[in-house]
Amino acid sequence: MVQFFKRPLLDIVHNHLIEYPTPVNIHYFWNFGFLAFICLAVQIITGIFLAIHYTPHVDLAFYSVEHIIRDVNYGWLLRYAHANGASIFFIIIYIHISRGLYYGSYVAPRHFTWVVGVFILLLIMATAFMGYVLPWGQISLWGATVITNLVSAVPLVGNSIVTWLWGGFSVDNATLNRFFSFHYLFPFIIVAIAFVHMAFLHQKGSGNPLGLIQPVDKISMYPYFIIKDAFGLVLFLLFFSLFVYFLPNLLGHPDNYIEANPIVTPNHIVPEWYFLPFYAILRSIPHKLGGVIAIIISILILAFLPWITNINVRSSLFRPLYKKLFWILFSIVLILGWIGGKPVEMPYVVIGQLITFLYFVYFLIFIPFLGRLEKFLVNYKTVY
């Protein structure tokens, strides 16, 4: 089998998936990049078959989704695998990012790998948002109205851009068609950029829990880590199957099973759970433009982490203070997610503003200050 992949045109598989030198001490948290690619493949395959039966028209979209579930052979499986696959995809992505934060994968020489990864995250979020509009339920319509209307906060040209996005003066048929087209296109762009992400990774080599560069004991990816990835894939499929077969509607919003009605506003408009922390940041800023800027910075600030961090030690195993701060950040994000799902009323507004403030303080003050403090307290030359 190995000899087969040494042939011309297939040697890229041999070099990057079979003989690729991998640090011997990586553990299962390094499996989530592979699982993310599996999730992306599942979303693309199920999405293609769903698009065959879906009708992007405001009068037919809701019923076409019902038709897929009720009348198409295994349509229920396609729909639930795609809908729950999005949630599982974000779980995998967030764990992948958390591992990078905990073990310092964003520090040079892998900083460009990290930046490309943040760009992929932005594309995934945009794709998921447009996909959530397609079932044309109540939350689909009103969520699209609320989020796209945020662009109107841009001075001078905001309202014109919103009208252009909508294709009219409200979220309507033109909007649905545009979102469907881009939702179909974006996953293929994500695949292309994911290969760029892998190219940067393989240029410098995979990281490891110790955060060391050289010397590191390495072994070939096949068969050792391929088997490890396969075991992780089995566990992932079991977890995924739990939602698809037994809890298919657990992660959905009940109001989105009601056909979109532009006259009736839902009592509580909330995005999918994976957007809730960022939605809480948006709502915590009273000024509309300020909220838009805050939510953009809250994501882009991850891309600037390699330059905000002023210490070359990567792994939190050698940074006890940073390790504690990481779990503080983890708690901050969980609280933001909880606040994002609550109504805009006291005391949730004040709590959201406080936690949003702590989120930005963590990245803009704690991280740079901690680097200087650790340099002062510890001689890190011995780590290498």
UniProtKB/Swiss-Prot annotation:
Q: Which Pfam families does the UniProt record give?
A: Cytochrom_B_C, Cytochrome_B
Record-level Gene Ontology MF annotations: metal ion binding; ubiquinol-cytochrome-c reductase activity
* Textual note on the cofactor: Binds 2 heme b groups non-covalently.
* GO annotations of cellular component type: mitochondrial inner membrane; respiratory chain complex III
Instruction: Tell me the keywords, alphabetical order.
Output: Electron transport, Heme, Iron, Membrane, Metal-binding, Mitochondrion, Mitochondrion inner membrane, Respiratory chain, Transmembrane, Transmembrane helix, Transport, Ubiquinone
PROSITE patterns found in the cross-reference section:
CYTB_CTER, CYTB_NTER
List, in alphabetical order, the GO biological process terms annotated in this UniProt record: mitochondrial electron transport, ubiquinol to cytochrome c
Primary location class: mitochondrion
Q: How does it assemble?
A: The main subunits of complex b-c1 are: cytochrome b, cytochrome c1 and the Rieske protein.
Report what the protein is called.
Answer: Cytochrome b
- Tell me the organism: Cyanidium caldarium
* Gene behind this protein: MT-CYB
